[in-house]
């Protein structure tokens, strides 16, 4: 069975680059009716935090990238790593090393001074050293000294590294903890991982890991090293370009559907298609069409996609996110129009859900403030008479008539005729009075969504405060 994994280290937030790797791994597993494993690589005890673990799990959950089976934690597998280390020592494929930090530092300085390749010189490799109680030691892997490590990378093609370039790396530290390059191999073997899709910053780790697979007589997985994501300026994507923490995108009003759609096309192509449902992503995804060159993050394109999903999604699919952002503003959504109806009206005018909540606040809050420029531009000496006439005409409407935007629009038009002024001389002051600004959806729709009671109350207030 095809089995992939996403194996983040909980030393910070869930980065968009990590999300893309997780997405590619998840899609490849789903495309092949396989399994997607989530593994938390928390062996760095000093830097790993529970807060970071929670951020990873929250991000994966928000995006809908559900793992199959349990979540694995490396810190819960230390006994297994020690067991395998002892097997390697017993088989003569690993050894105890007693070299002190001082000796290794002197060795490194000597190598640098003489333009030699830096790395461990193998002093303890064949010394048959057995540590005594109280002695400090590490365990090193006996890397092959001859030959070449080669693999056919699913993204980068054939890659070969001479074993002469690799030294005997430490697989168990002096404090007894196992090291990253060793743990991941044991994990991938035990979890039957068949395909490893990860960032190309791991390419240099791959030959070391392949040698451990072979030493353990295990099948070597297929590797697919995905290029990094660059900022718009071509530099590595970082905080200075904008949000890189995926949950910050939620706070900024982006939908998970938009994030996934954007990231799947960032370095992977399927003809000219830009919009993908999750089902379409799963059906179309393959490793062959991952681009070997880095991709630049385009924030404007992400915003365009987000707008598309706000406009085109079924309300049920985005309701949780819409309600989340309205809750953040403190607005009482029971004091206004149905959110489903509101989104249908406002979607064309916003790029994010933050904008949606902000630009719709006047529908739910009775405490509206007037935009000074809009008041100055649209409220004139004659506006009071217009408001009086509007109130008279609105009061005459029954509840059923108030549900028809066309009827309401006609009332505004009729009022303009009665006052012998143009439509704009009525519609724009009315907008300012009931929304606080000169911008809103179609006036008939705005009136309907606000409801008769709010409109009458706000017109009355505006008449008293703005038309003195």
From Swiss-Prot:
InterPro entries to which the protein is assigned, alphabetical: aa-tRNA-synth_I_cd-bd, aa-tRNA-synth_I_codon-bd_sub2, aa-tRNA-synth_I_CS, aa_tRNA-synth_I_cd-bd_sf, Glu-tRNA-ligase_bac/mito, Glu/Gln-tRNA-synth, Glu/Gln-tRNA-synth_Ib_cat-dom, GluQ/Sye
For this chain the motif 'KMSKS' region maps to 236-240
**Any one GO BP annotation for this protein:** glutamyl-tRNA aminoacylation
Matching entries from PROSITE patterns are given as: AA_TRNA_LIGASE_I
Cofactor(s) listed: Zn(2+)
According to the record, cofactor stoichiometry and binding are noted as: Binds 1 zinc ion per subunit.
* Keywords in alphabetical order: Aminoacyl-tRNA synthetase, ATP-binding, Cytoplasm, Ligase, Metal-binding, Nucleotide-binding, Protein biosynthesis, Zinc
Pull one GO CC term from this UniProt entry.
cytosol
Q: Which residues bind ATP?
A: 239
Coarsely, its chief localization is cytoplasm
A Pfam short name: tRNA-synt_1c
Q: Which Gene3D superfamilies match?
A: 1.10.10.350, HUPs (3.40.50.620)
Reaction(s) catalysed (UniProt annotation):
tRNA(Glu) + L-glutamate + ATP = L-glutamyl-tRNA(Glu) + AMP + diphosphate
Function (record text): Catalyzes the attachment of glutamate to tRNA(Glu) in a two-step reaction: glutamate is first activated by ATP to form Glu-AMP and then transferred to the acceptor end of tRNA(Glu).
Describe the family membership recorded for this protein in Swiss-Prot or TrEMBL: Belongs to the class-I aminoacyl-tRNA synthetase family. Glutamate--tRNA ligase type 1 subfamily.
Q: How is this protein named in the record? A: Glutamate--tRNA ligase
* Designated gene of the protein: gltX
């Amino acid at each position: 069975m095809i089995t992939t994994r996403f194996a983040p280290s909980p030393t910070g937030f869930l980065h968009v680059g990590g999300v893309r790797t997780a997405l590619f791994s998840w899609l490849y597993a789903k495309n092949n009716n396989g399994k997607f494993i989530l593994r938390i690589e928390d062996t760095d005890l000093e830097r790993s935090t529970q807060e970071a673990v929670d951020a990873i799990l929250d991000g994966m959950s928000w995006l809908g990238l559900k793992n199959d089976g349990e979540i694995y934690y490396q810190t819960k597998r230390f006994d297994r790593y020690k067991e395998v280390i002892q097997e390697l020592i017993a088989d003569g494929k690993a050894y105890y090393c007693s070299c002190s930090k001082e000796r290794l530092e002197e060795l490194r300085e000597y190598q640098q001074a003489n333009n030699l390749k830096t790395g461990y010189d193998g002093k303890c490799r064949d010394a048959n050293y057995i540590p005594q109680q109280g002695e400090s030691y590490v365990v090193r892997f006996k890397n092959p000294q001859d030959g070449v490590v080669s693999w056919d990378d699913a993204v980068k093609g054939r890659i070969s590294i001479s074993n002469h370039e690799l030294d005997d790396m430490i697989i168990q530290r002096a404090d007894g903890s196992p090291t990253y390059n060793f743990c991941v191999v044991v994990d991938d073997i035990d979890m039957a991982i068949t395909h490893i899709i990860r960032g190309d910053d791991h390419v240099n780790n791959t030959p070391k890991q392949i040698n451990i697979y072979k030493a353990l007589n295990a099948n070597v997985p297929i590797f697919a090293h995905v290029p990094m994501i660059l900022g718009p300026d071509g530099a590595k994507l970082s905080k200075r370009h904008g949000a890189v923490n995926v949950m910050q995108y939620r706070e900024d009003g982006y939908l998970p559907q938009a994030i996934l759609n954007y990231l799947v096309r960032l370095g992977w192509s399927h003809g000219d298609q830009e919009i993908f449902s999750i089902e379409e992503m799963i059906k179309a995804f393959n490793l062959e069409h991952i681009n070997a060159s880095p991709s630049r993050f385009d924030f404007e394109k992400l915003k365009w996609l987000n707008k598309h999903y706000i406009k085109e999604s079924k309300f049920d699919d985005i309701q949780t996110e819409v309600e989340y952002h309205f809750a953040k503003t403190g607005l009482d959504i029971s004091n206004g129009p149905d959110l489903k109806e509101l989104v249908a009206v406002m979607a064309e005018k916003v790029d994010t859900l933050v904008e949606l909540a902000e630009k719709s606040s006047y529908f739910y809050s009775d405490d509206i403030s007037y935009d000074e420029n809009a008041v100055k531009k649209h409220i004139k000496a004659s506006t009071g008479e217009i408001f009086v006439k509007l109130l008279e005409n609105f009061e005459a409407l029954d509840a059923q008539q108030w549900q028809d935007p066309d009827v309401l629009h006609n009332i505004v038009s009729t009022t303009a005729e009665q006052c012998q002024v143009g439509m704009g001389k009525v519609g724009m002051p009315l907008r300012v009075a009931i929304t606080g600004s000169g911008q809103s959806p179609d006036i008939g729709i705005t009136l309907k969504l606000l409801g008769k009671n709010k409109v009458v109350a706000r017109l009355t207030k505006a008449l008293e405060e703005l038309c003195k």
